[in-house]
Amino acid sequence: FYQFEENRVVEFQALWDLPEVMMQAGAWPMPPSLGREWHVPGPATQDGLVPGPYDEEHGLKSCQLIIDMLTAMKRHPSQGGPEVMEMEKYWHPRMSWYGPSGIGTGRGISGFRNWHQIPFLNAMPDRGQYVDQINYHFFGDRNYVAVTGWPNMIQTLTHDGWMGIAPAGKRVTMRSLDFWRIEKGLI
């Protein structure tokens, strides 16, 4: 993401995918990813570059869908089982979730839950409890939404099972860049 002031870039945010570099170099020190490791393709609709003009109303509507989905997802595990997330309300049943290196790809809601969400929440069940200490910014344009935050997640690593990281009982912060494509009201 780039921040512009007076037609100049004043800030640039990027995540260096060091795990991917380590994998390419054959120096991966952790257990294999739970999901499939491979490149992240462009959007299935092949319309990832959105020409102008900017449609603010559509962009705001798309952002709101993502915010509603994230709000529902944060209900679990503190407010009940997986059903409180209402994932079928927001996610297409055949969606693809492309995680970073070390996590991998999940196909469909069950793939996302099995290969990323369940291990992640088991290891850090206090997800979503420190919203007053995080920052995030949403961007929406037509059917695409992105969010970045530095940090936008704070959790405590209390259990094992996620990327082979030992449960040290330490709070960790995470920076992320997440992108979503919406089709017919579903992610």
Per-region residue spans from a language model:
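C-terminal and inter-domain tail/linker signature
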Residues: 1-187
